[in-house]
């Protein structure tokens, strides 16, 4: 038997992080009973985003063009390359108002339990970017979680022998913390106090 439209909507809403069956059911009923125009806008926005948004060819963040605005900006320092896990982390770095270099967004972290290794993260693309002859320093701004640390260690081991300077943001970011939840002042301090990796 095919699921009903309501069941399909509830199941679709469950794909969102932190949304379980009960929350998905409440959302579905709210959209259908109280906010059908909102449901239409939501559906249209999701469809538009899926059709228009892709990955930047240089930094791997989300963009509607081939190259994002940050990568296209002549005001950014091309000698600095900050590696972050997600676009949200990149936005947090921008909010510090202290970093004016370029970015590379991993779109994840090394997590063997989740089946994510260096190949799945596309670290070969990061390597190509870091060794382009322009980048002088790679700043690792992965989260201070076990997976973020493993990712930073792997990238350091990959780049250090190639002569690229590799630094890590300081531990102003709490151990086990994620950049998304760190205030911009703490993140700015961590960025200023970054350290050389691999020593």
Curated annotation (Swiss-Prot):
Function: May play a role in DNA repair. It seems to be involved in an RecBC-independent recombinational process of DNA repair. It may act with RecF and RecO.
GO molecular function: DNA binding; zinc ion binding
SMART domains on file: TOPRIM
UniProt source species: Dechloromonas aromatica (strain RCB)
Keyword Repeat part of the UniProt annotation: no
Family (UniProt): Belongs to the RecR family.
Record protein name field: Recombination protein RecR
ZnF C4-type: positions: 56-71
CDD domains named among the record's database cross-references: TOPRIM_recR (cd01025)
GO terms classed as biological process: DNA recombination; DNA repair
SUPFAM superfamilies: Recombination protein RecR
Toprim domain location: 79-174
Xref: PANTHER family: RECOMBINATION PROTEIN RECR
Stored InterPro entries: DNA_Rcmb_RecR (IPR000093), Rcmb_RecR (IPR023627), Rcmb_RecR_Znf (IPR015967), TOPRIM_dom (IPR006171), TOPRIM_RecR (IPR034137)
Tagged with keyword Repeat: no
Source domain of life: Bacteria
Keywords assigned by UniProt, alphabetized: DNA damage, DNA recombination, DNA repair, Metal-binding, Zinc, Zinc-finger
Membrane-crossing segments per the record: none
